[in-house]
A protein has these predicted regions:
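Acidic/histidine-rich catalytic cores of soluble enzymes
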Residues: 69, 132-206
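Conserved glycine-rich "GG(E/T)P / GGGxP" loop and the immediately following alpha-helix
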Residues: 78-84, 118-120, 153
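Glycine/proline-rich, positively charged
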Residues: 115-131
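Active-site-proximal loop/turn and secondary-structure-junction residues that shape catalytic pockets
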Residues: 9, 33-35, 72-75, 110-114, ...
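Short, well-structured alpha-helical interface segments that form or flank functional binding sites
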Residues: 16, 123-126, 153
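Residue-level signal for well-ordered alpha-helical segments
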Residues: 3-13, 36, 112, 119, ...
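Active-site groove signature of glycoside hydrolases
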Residues: 98-119, 138-152
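N-terminal pre-domain/capping segments
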Residues: 1-104, 129, 136-137, 169-171, ...
């Protein structure tokens, strides 16, 4: 078992993320948002090349390896109506950086649904499948997080997404079901049951 955490949940700056990870005795980190000294805060796959090079060196010097990228690909800040070029650009920037750091996994999502939506549009399936294939073709494994996204609307929606995007795997956030409605049920939607969700998707979690 490898223990790690998402860096920016310990602090915005790279140095504080490294400090927290080392204090826990962990050897791995999942970088997401990051402020490298001298550069504005951005996602690890979006920071300038010079900032990325500096971050990689600092992580290596600290004895930390990058196990997974906490990306912004199709996350809850994006909608399926946004130009797909935004997503494709993020994927194309992430791939060489994953290879540089030796990371095999990348956390992705499936766009934020509208407040009253309870079905996943075909375009979401198409985009997630395309993104999944882009990573798999490079020997990298995308993992979908259950969050405020179409695939996270219920465990049934998650399994439907996996069926439509062969090769996609999951990362399970135990806290997210607590504040997300179960859109597989009639309105008014109850909150999701984290244990029930886990029981149905656990075989697909890496």
């Amino acid at each position: 078992m490898k223990l790690m955490g998402i860096g920016d949940e310990a602090g915005g700056g790279l140095d504080s993320q490294i400090t927290a990870t080392r204090e826990l005795g962990w050897k791995h980190i999942e970088p997401r948002g990051m402020e490298v000294p001298g550069f504005a805060k951005a996602n690890f796959h979006e920071i300038p090349d010079a900032a990325f090079d500096l971050a990689v060196k600092k992580l290596e010097d600290a004895g930390l390896s990058v196990y997974c990228f906490g990306s912004t690909v199709m996350n809850w800040a994006k909608k399926v109506g946004d130009p797909f070029d935004i997503t494709l650009g993020e994927v194309k920037r992430a791939i060489p950086r994953m290879k540089r750091t030796g990371a095999k996994y990348i956390r992705i999502m499936s766009f934020k649904p509208g407040d009253d939506e309870f079905q996943t549009p075909p375009e979401v399936f198409r985009r997630v499948k395309d993104v999944t294939n882009m990573f798999l073709d490079q020997g990298l494994q995308p993992v979908h997080e259950n969050c405020m996204n179409y695939g996270g609307m219920s465990w049934q929606h998650t399994l439907e997404l996996l069926d439509k995007a062969p090769g996609l795997k999951l990362v399970f956030d135990t806290a997210n079901p607590i504040f997300n409605p179960d859109r597989s049920r009639p309105k008014p939607w109850p909150r999701q049951d984290a244990w029930e969700f886990w029981e149905h998707v656990r075989d697909h979690v890496v």
